[in-house]
Amino acid sequence: MKYKQFIFKDYRFDAETKVLELHYGMDDALEFTETFTFDFELAQYDPHALDRALQNLFFMAGISYYKMYIPPEIVVHQGKLDQASADFFSKTYQRGLGEFWYVNKLNPRTSVIFPVNTTESQLFTSDGKGLLASVGGGKDSLLTIELLRRYHPYTTTHPTPEKPQPAAKSGTLTSFDHSISNLQVPKTPSEKAADQQAREKARRAESGFLTTWSVNHRPQLTPLVERIGLPHYWVERAWDPQLQTLNQQDALNGHIPISAIFACVGTIVAILAGKRDVVMSNEQSANEPTLTYEGVPINHQYSKSQEFEEDYQALLKRQFGDSIRYYSLLRPYSELHIAELFARLAFDKYKDVFSSCNRAYVHTSDHMSWCGICPKCAFTFLVLTPFIPRKKLEALWGGKNLLLDPGLEPLYEQLLGIAGDKPLDCVGEVKESRAAMTLAQQQYPQLLKYHFDLPADYDYRKLWPASMPEELLRLVILQV
C-alpha cells in the first residue's frame, strides 16, 4: 500500500457562515478538506446533538478519500467512536464499497476497521417536529412528497366537514322557534376532537410541517423545487479538488455509498431546520444484489437497502432516541408499483421538470434532462410505459421511443436478465423489469422478441416489509 494510515483529522462548524469543514489526511503526505454549506435560516438547536450528527457525517464522508488508496489503518484524531458506532462505520465502508472492490479487482472481503476510542455512549435529544423529504430530482422522491401531501394527517388543510343540520319543515316555526334554529347544535366530544385535529392539521401545514431538502445541483433543481412549492433547504457540498487530480494519476476510483453520506447530511439538516423525520425514497428493489463477485453479493444500491437503513436507524436510536427518525417511505413498493402511482399522482404535475437520468445534471444547464442511453433512462421508460400514454412518455426524450431503439437492445437484455449481469446502476429487480416488459408487449408486439420467464403469481403491487414508523405505514401506505 502506498499509504499506511487514513486519518480523520478534525471537523469544524461555523454557525455564522453555516459552513462545515471536514479535514482528512494520509500519513503525513496528503491533506484533504471537504465542505458542506447549509444555506438556510437555522432554527434553535441543541449544540451537543448537532455535534454528534456532525461526527457521523465526518466519519461517513471520509470514504471518498479513504477509497483512493485504502490504507490498512484508520486513525481518529477528533470524534468519538464506541464499539457499536465503530462497527457501523466499518460495515458500511466494507459493504458500501462492494462495487468498488469489484471494478478495481480487489478482494471483496477486504477488512475495514474503525478504531474504538471511547466506552461512553451518550444520548442526545433534538426537539424538531415535522417531515424533511429528500429531493433527488427523480420520480421516487416526487411520489414520496405527493403521498405525504395527500395522506399524512398533518400535511393537509382540508377541514372536517360540518355535520349537516336537518331541514326545517315549512310553516311550523314560530318566531321563538326560529331563533332557536339559528343556534349551533352542540357538537359531540368526538366531533370536537375531530375539529381540533383539523385545526392542528391546518396549523402544521401552514407552518411547514412538510419540507424538502437537497444536496447540490441548485440551478437544475430550482424549477422542480418551485413546482413542488414547499419550504426547501439547500445544502452545497464541495469536494477537495485533489480528488480529481489524484484520480487522474494513481488513485483508485469507483462507486461509493453516496446515500449513506446523504443520510448523515439529512440528519444534520433535520437538527438545523428543527425537523424530526428524514424521509427518503428508497424502494424494495434496492435490496437486490447487482451481481456476485468471488462468492460475495455486490449491491450497487447498498446504502439504499433496508439493511443499511436499519443499521443507521439503530445508530440514531442509540444517539438520539426517538427524537430523530430516518426511513424510506417507498420501501414497501416495487419499482413497477412506484411507476404506477407516480403516473397517477405526480406525472402530469412534474413531467417537464423531473428526471431520473444519470446525466440529468449538466452543469451548464438550468434544468434537468434525459440522455436516452443510460440504464436509468432505459429502465424508467420501461416501467412507465404501461401507465403513461405513448406520446406523453416519448415527449420526455424528444419524441424518441427507447423500447424500439435497436441500440438499447443489449441494455434491455441486461435489465431482463437475459444476457449478463444487471447494470451497475439504480435500476429495479430483474423480475420487475420482466413484469413491466410483459405489460409493454401488449402495446408493442415487436417486443415479443424478448424471451424470459416470469412466475405466474408475481404481483408487483404486493407490499413488502419496511422499517418506517407505524403511523406512516397506517396513515399513508395503507391508504393509497
Regions found by a protein language model. Give the residues of each.
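Alpha-helix capping and helix-loop boundary segments enriched in small/acidic/polar residues
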Residues: D250-P257, V296-K304, Y326-Y333, M368-C371
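ATP/NTP-dependent adenylation/nucleotidyl-transfer catalytic domains that generate, transfer
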Residues: M1-L22, A29, V296, R318, ...
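Short, basic, low-complexity termini and linkers enriched in Ser/Thr/Gly/Pro
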Residues: P153-G171, F176-K187, A193-K201, A205, ...
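RNA-binding accessory domains that recognize and position tRNA/RNA substrates
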Residues: M1-G130, S141-L142, L147-H152, L210, ...
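Short helix-capping/linker segments at secondary-structure and domain boundaries
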Residues: Y65-H77, A270-V278, L384-A395, Q442-Q446
